Design a protein with these regions (language model features):
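A general secondary-structure junction signal
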Residues: 56-58, 104, 182
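Active-site-flanking beta-strand signature of metal-NTP-handling nucleotidyl enzymes
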Residues: 99-103
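Small-aliphatic-rich amphipathic alpha-helix that forms the alpha element of a beta-alpha
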Residues: 39-40, 106, 115-164
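Short, hinge-like loop/turn segments at secondary-structure boundaries
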Residues: 72-73, 167-170
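Short acidic/glycine-rich loop or secondary-structure boundary segments that cap or lie
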Residues: 64-66, 108-112, 187
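N-terminal amphipathic, basic helical "cap/leader" segment at the start of enzyme domains
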Residues: 1-98, 204-205
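Short, surface-exposed, charged loop/turn segments at secondary-structure junctions
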Residues: 70-71, 113-122, 192-193
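C-terminal helix-cap and adjacent tail motif
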Residues: 3-4, 8-12, 16-19, 173-205
């Protein structure tokens, strides 16, 4: 089923974490950029502040990011943990085709806080909600294209060196890193579901 005929519910069900991927993708760079662009344009944000930001790293820039993650993590994590957990996973992510860095503009958030002081204290939390929706939208669209995708969090190790490498504006706060490529292996862990009845309440129906 193509992305054009996939229903929204089917796309939501299809979305999952796939970590074992390669850089041998059939999707065009233009299509990847279109997906991220549409996500940024249409994902909701508090008071329509449009604070969501993204940096798309492909091919060698993608690999450079994971080289940065390797060196930054090695310098910050105890050697046993780095060698057992960090290094193998970073190597796995480096083998992918691309990484999307998701940011939130602190200037955009502070602008709303200045205009509407009563919501200023809530803006950081709402910003996290907004960024999560942007990440989810892009993740779902990439999976609908047949890509394997996973969401990673290597902050704060990578924040400063990545900002320096790609000249990221100072007010952009890094939230997550989305790795994608051609699926080449099974999920590291199959999806399981707790009973919905224990997680949902309905009144008045």
């Amino acid at each position: 089923m193509s992305p054009n005929t996939l229903s929204l519910l089917d796309a939501i069900k299809q979305r999952s974490s796939l970590h074992v991927v390669s850089d041998d993708v059939s999707i065009s760079d233009a299509r990847i950029q279109e997906i991220v662009r549409e996500g940024i344009l249409h994902a909701p944000s508090p008071f329509n502040c449009q604070a969501g930001r993204a940096v798309v790293l492909l091919k060698e820039d993608h690999k450079k990011f994971w080289d940065i993650a390797h060196d930054a993590s090695k310098a910050s994590v105890p050697p046993p943990a780095f060698e057992k957990a960090f290094e193998p996973r970073i190597k796995m992510f480096r083998a992918a085709y691309g990484t999307i860095l998701f940011y939130e503009s602190q200037d955009a958030l502070e602008k709303i806080g200045s205009k509407v002081p009563m919501v200023k204290a809530a803006m950081p939390q709402w910003s996290e909600h907004s960024s999560g929706m942007l990440q989810y939208a892009v993740w779902t669209m990439l999976c609908a294209e047949g890509l394997g995708v996973s969401l990673q969090h290597y902050s704060p190790f990578v924040d400063a060196p990545a900002a320096k490498q790609w000249n990221i504006p100072a007010d952009w706060s890094l939230k997550a890193q989305m790795v994608f490529g051609k699926p080449t292996g099974p999920r590291l862990q199959e999806k399981t579901f707790e009973p919905v009845e224990d997680r949902m309440k309905v009144f008045g129906a």
